[in-house]
Amino acid sequence: MLAPGQLERINFLANKAKTEGLSQDEMNEQQNLRQEYLKAFRQSFKSQMMGMKVVDPDGNDVTPEKLKEDQKRYRGE
């Protein structure tokens, strides 16, 4: 999870880069913030996928076997 204000800082640096450019320190900060954001996004996405179940219109579980296996590993079963 990103700390409060990090997303705003990412957006601020992106806008500044477009309008006036960034110093080397700001470019490094932007890169680090983007990496943290991607890590948090991927972790959140994986958590959502590991809780997902696919059901057809008849109510049958049609979750792909690969996903079921990954879910079992994720839960430690």
Swiss-Prot record:
Entries under SUPFAM superfamilies matching the protein: YnzC-like
The keyword Cytoplasm appears for this protein: yes
Residue ranges with Basic and acidic residues bias: 63-77
Intrachain disulfide bonds: none
Keywords linked to the UniProt accession: Cytoplasm
Superkingdom of this protein's organism: Bacteria
First-listed, main subcellular location of the protein, grouped into a coarse class: cytoplasm
Subcellular location: Cytoplasm
Region of interest (Disordered), residue spans: 53-77
One annotated Gene Ontology cellular component of this protein: cytoplasm
Family, similarity comment: Belongs to the UPF0291 family.
Stored HAMAP family: UPF0291
Protein name in the entry: UPF0291 protein EAT1b_0405
Organism name: Exiguobacterium sp. (strain ATCC BAA-1283 / AT1b)
